[in-house]
Structure formats: structure tokens, C-alpha cells
Amino acid sequence: MATDFTKYIASVPDYPEKGIMFRDISPLMADGQAFHAATDEIVAYAKDKDVEMVVGPEARGFIVGCPVAYEMGIGFAPARKEGKLPRETVKASYDLEYGQSALYLHKDAIKPGQKVLVTDDLLATGGTIGATIQLVEDLGGIVVGTAFLIELQDLHGRDKLKGYDIFSLMQY
């Protein structure tokens, strides 16, 4: 029987600002069986894609990506904010509601031709994941799939990821 993962998501109105419904994954992470089952769902999605590396953006992409990489017996590379990686990096900028941000990946994190799964907790507007994909591709990696615990459908992030395979465990 399939797990109803939505019962492990806390919906917090007006956070971080009025009019926003925040979807908190903390209860899912706090329940070992549910978190393991959610990880297994993403692993099942990725199994037939010959994934060789998982990449996730700071910070909740680490929470999703690391256990997936562990279960698959492959590596994980973190896409971080400025100043967080100690060696030579590549950079991808993306738009925020007011301004811009950027993510960085070590230049040697991805080998040319390496098949990569990009993971995050949430697909909203697609900006963060779009930048993460750009980093992977700038290094010659091939994004064979993207996986999320939650997709906020009203924000149309899927539209920014046209041409990429998208898996989301829950949709709101």
C-alpha cells in the first residue's frame, strides 16, 4: 500500500511572510520509516536512469540528495551559496522575487558525460533547480532526472524545466 506522505508535511500559513503557505518537511524527516519510504520512492524513480552522481542545492537539497546517493551507492555533490566551497568553482545565477542569487559547484564535482540526478525538497518557481542544472551541464554532466519531495504546482516551476524528466512525490 502506498504511503500518504502529505500527512507528514506541516502546512504553516503566512510563513515566511503573509500570503505564503509554507510546506515544512520536518515532520517527514522526524519519522524514520516515512523518510526512508520517501527516499525509496526517489531511488525507485532513479534506478533505471543509470545515475552516477546526485547533486542537490543548499540546504534542503542535501537532506533529500544524500540519502538517495547513499541508497544507490553513488556520490553526492553539494551546490552551495557563495563562499561555502573551498576549491575552484563554477557559478550559476538565478532570479529571486527581488534580485538575484547564485549557486556554486566545485569544478571537479562532475565528470564530463556523467549522468546526474538533481534533487531538492521543493519545486516552486524552478529558479534554484534551473541554476543547479546549469552548473551540472556547464561541467559536462548529463541531467537524467530531477526529483523533489514536494511540487507547488501553482508556481509553474515545471515550465522552467521543460525537456527534463521531473519526479515529485507530493503535489500541492
Curated annotation (Swiss-Prot):
- Biological process GO annotation list? adenine salvage; AMP salvage; purine ribonucleoside salvage
Pathway(s) served: Purine metabolism; AMP biosynthesis via salvage pathway; AMP from adenine: step 1/1
Q: What class of enzyme is it?
A: transferase
Catalytic activity entry: AMP + diphosphate = 5-phospho-alpha-D-ribose 1-diphosphate + adenine
CDD domains reported for this sequence: PRTases_typeI
Subcellular location(s) of the protein = Cytoplasm
| Chief place where the protein resides | cytoplasm
Main role?
Catalyzes a salvage reaction resulting in the formation of AMP, that is energically less costly than de novo synthesis.
Similarity comment text for this entry: Belongs to the purine/pyrimidine phosphoribosyltransferase family.
How does this polypeptide assemble, per the annotation?
Homodimer.
Please report the name of this protein according to its UniProt entry. Answer: Adenine phosphoribosyltransferase
**Could you tell me which species this protein originates from?**
Levilactobacillus brevis (strain ATCC 367 / BCRC 12310 / CIP 105137 / JCM 1170 / LMG 11437 / NCIMB 947 / NCTC 947)
Q: What is the lineage of its organism?
A: Bacteria, Bacillati, Bacillota, Bacilli, Lactobacillales
